UniProtKB/Swiss-Prot annotation:
Biased composition (Basic and acidic residues): 603-646, 685-707
Protein name: ATP-dependent rRNA helicase SPB4
Compositional bias annotation for Pro residues: 143-152
Free-text function comment from the UniProt entry: ATP-binding RNA helicase involved in the biogenesis of 60S ribosomal subunits. Binds 90S pre-ribosomal particles and dissociates from pre-60S ribosomal particles after processing of 27SB pre-rRNA. Required for the normal formation of 18S rRNA through the processing of pre-rRNAs at sites A0, A1 and A2, and the normal formation of 25S and 5.8S rRNAs through the processing of pre-rRNAs at sites C1 and C2.
Compositional bias segments (type: Low complexity): 132-142
Domain of life per record: Eukaryota
Species: Cryptococcus neoformans var. neoformans serotype D (strain JEC21 / ATCC MYA-565)
């Protein structure tokens, strides 16, 4: 078991040392949550945000940014002398995803629902200090209970809010938390304009601001919201990275903001300068080098090694596409080696309710190293979603946007806890990604290759034989349901598309992409029909011929590893879907296709015959006669040849002359009669076809002439001489 990573110390100091001090009821809630000290970002942000200052906060993921804006909003709400009236909004928090908005809402809800009502003062002791100054006047004289806090609870405005206006009118919230599109629709809808009053708005918070502003749709909605709100407000931007879009927004929407940048530095030996980093100090950030064909194998071994040897119990595995998450969830959950793992699928194409259920199932699972929980997901769970107990993050695919790397890795080692992150990199050029990240202040250390005995070794020189074994195991699973084969092909294609759109394309080059190797890792039955694969095979064959030519000329050639591929032996006509409905639809399609094929064959044969007849009809009479003459000449030559052969036999003394002459004469007579019958039949058939075609041509001509006469006036000349033909 590796040595424990020490928890990162909180350099922000005690909550009691804040100036101005926080309200006692807020401190009580913070203490009940187990936070004894502030993080640096909280110590730097809260005092300024409580005062009348706009804040732009840049800090590493997992540094406590949520409390850094939640506490100032509540403190300003608590210090307000005049209570907010029904329908008035005190603060709006905008988050890029539904999951992040839900978690922020849960934090606000925890604070506001924990207040002690003043009516219970005689029973609970002195609570005067716990209550805000306007507590007695902020509610009607009706008695209050613990179920009715001093402040209205916050309202969540996302796709999961079915009746937002009814909820707003029944609860009268002062704080709104939601996603950009839903908030913009809620506030700017005519009904929202009538019942939601923002003239007294105090604070606007943009969490994960770089992601909010990187999406054109999100940015448009954020700008609409900001234009609707009063200019005399506090605006706070929080993010782990600052982009040009964020800088532009700072100039447009903030007034003299204070910048708060929290950097982490590694401790060094005497004489060494500390290095700045953008990941938590308690994070063991690593990379593992393997062939693409070995990636799924290494993923499985990492899960087994970390859970068995290091007793890790909660994992997140990131893929580049939703299709890959869906496919690998179905495959990995059926592998016997991972039977003790509880797998959950989570990606952006799932309906909101299912996403919410999946996230809840994963976070609430009582995981242990004997029954670990694994979340297979895309970048929808890379930012903002707060997982407090993640032990290991594995990146099956490096993120398309390098800025996302620190957000993915930051799902572990949060709030001072230790954690580990591993990114799987292909052998070769992809190893340059380590230096690329180091320049971006994200240092990585090497995670050794894991062999079949879960031992750490060097990357093998040849393809791990277990990769082929795993390929056959996955294929056996796929062969149980044709739908899995469809999903495998879809995930393979989508993974390549994501690879081709990588921002670090000078490292992740499509020219170096090995389709055979990737197909082994995905367990495909056959390579999908992609133009890129066809081009790749041509280039591969041309390169092979070039190297062979150099070898034949005595030149030296650097041997490159070639990973061969062989399609599985599958009868695709009988390979069935497990779903009866889908299989019935497939069989119906096959039958329809067969009928169409036979109909098409008959139609093509008829078209060929018609073209031949038309071509012969278009021939001049002299050419037709000449063709018949040539045919007769060929037959006469054939008869003359046979006669010559017979005479030659007679000269050599072979055969009976009289009987042979009789046979030849009889055969010639029969051929002549048969030829005459064929010519008569042919002439009759041609005559019928000719008459039929002539009739069709005449009808077409008549229609054209009549339409021409009706449109342009020359109606008499249009068809008056048709009968003279």
């Amino acid at each position: 078991m590796d040595a424990p990573v020490p928890a990162a110390p909180a350099f922000g100091g005690s909550w009691a040392k804040l100036n101005p001090p926080l309200s006692p009821w807020i401190l009580d809630v913070i203490n009940s949550m187990g936070f004894k000290n502030m993080t640096p970002v909280q110590a730097g942000t809260i005092p300024r945000a409580v005062k009348n200052q706009d804040c732009v906060v840049e800090a590493v993921t997992g540094s406590g940014k949520t409390l850094a804006f939640t506490i100032p909003v509540l403190e300003r709400l608590s210090r307000r002398e005049e209570p907010y009236k029904k329908g008035e909004i005190a603060a709006i928090v905008v988050a890029p995803t539904r999951e992040l908005a839900t978690q922020i809402h849960a934090v606000f809800h925890h604070f506001l629902s924990s207040l002690i009502p003043p009516e219970s003062e005689e029973e609970t002791g002195d609570v005067e200090a716990h209550a805000p100054p306007f507590a007695s006047s902020s509610r009607s004289p009706s008695p209050q209970t613990p179920d009715k806090p001093l402040f209205p609870l916050p309202m969540l405005v996302t796709s999961g809010t079915p009746t937002p206006y009814e909820t707003f009118q029944s609860t009268h919230p002062s704080i709104l938390i939601g996603t950009p599109g839903r908030l913009a629709a809620f506030l700017l809808n005519p009904r929202g304009l009538a019942i939601v009053r923002v003239s007294e708005l105090d604070v606007l918070v943009l969490d994960e601001a770089d992601r909010l502003l990187s999406s054109p749709d999100h940015r448009r909605d954020v700008e609409r919201i900001m234009r609707h709100l009063p200019k005399q407000r506090r605006t706070h931007l929080f993010s782990a990275t600052m982009t040009d879009a964020v800088e532009e927004m700072i100039g447009l929407g903030l007034r003299n903001p204070v910048r708060i940048v929290v950097n982490l530095k590694d401790k060094r030996k005497d004489g060494e300068e500390p290095k700045e980093r953008r990941t938590p100090m308690a994070l063991q950030n690593t990379y593992l080098v393997c062939r693409h064909a070995e990636k799924t194998l290494q993923l499985i071994r990492l899960l087994l090694c970390e859970s068995t040897k290091h007793e890790r119990s909660k994992f997140i595995v990131y893929f580049s596409t939703c299709a890959a998450v869906d496919y690998f969830y179905r495959i990995l959950s059926r592998l016997p080696s991972l039977s003790k793992f509880h797998l959950t699928s989570f990606h952006g194409e799932l309906p909101p309710k299912i996403r919410e259920t999946a996230l809840s199932t994963f976070t609430s699972h009582p995981s242990s190293h004997l029954s670990p929980a694994v979340l297979l997901c895309t970048d929808v769970a890379a930012r903002g979603v707060d997982f407090l107990d993640i032990d290991v993050v594995i990146q099956y695919d490096a993120p398309t946007d390098p800025k996302t790397f620190s957000h993915r890795a930051g799902r572990t080692a949060r709030a001072g806890r230790r954690g580990k992150a591993v990114v799987l990199l292909g052998k070769g050029r992809e190893e340059d990604y380590v230096d690329f990240l180091n320049i971006r202040k994200i240092p990585l250390t090497k995670q050794p290759y894991i062999n079949a005995y879960l031992e750490e070794v060097d990357t093998p020189q040849a393809l791990d034989p277990e990769a082929t074994t795993l390929l056959h195991s996955i294929r056996q699973i796929i062969l149980t349901d044709r739908e899995l084969s469809d999903k495998a092909a879809k995930s393979f294609v989508s993974a390549f598309r994501a690879y081709s759109k990588h921002e670090a394309s000078f490292i992740f080059r499509t020219l170096d992409f090995d389709f055979n190797s990737q197909a082994i890792s995905f367990g495909l039955l056959r390579l999908p029909a992609m133009p890129e694969i066809k081009d790749w095979k041509k280039k591969k064959e041309a390169e092979r011929q070039r190297l062979e030519k150099i070898k034949s000329e005595g030149g030296e050639v650097e041997e490159k590893e070639i990973i061969e591929w062989e399609d599985a032996g599958v009868n695709w006509d009988t390979f069935a879907y497990a779903s009866r409905q889908r299989e019935a639809a497939r069989l119906a399609t096959l039958a329809q296709r067969a009928d169409n094929q036979s109909s098409n064959d008959a139609a093509r044969a008829e078209a060929r015959a018609k073209r031949k007849i038309k071509a012969e009809m278009r021939e001049a009479w002299s050419e037709q006669k000449e063709r018949k003459v040539r045919k007769e000449e060929r037959k006469e030559k054939k008869d003359a040849k046979k006669k010559y052969e017979w005479e030659l036999e007679q000269a050599n003394g072979e055969g009976d002359r009289q009987s042979d002459l009789a046979n030849i004469a009889k055969a010639q007579a029969e051929r002549k009669k048969r030829r005459e019958r064929e010519e008569e039949s042919w002439d009759e058939e041609i005559g019928k076809e000719y008459k039929s075609l002539k009739r069709e041509i005449k009808e077409e001509k008549s229609v054209k002439e009549s339409s021409k006469g009706g449109a342009g006036g020359g109606g008499i000349g249009g068809g008056m001489f048709d009968d003279l033909e």
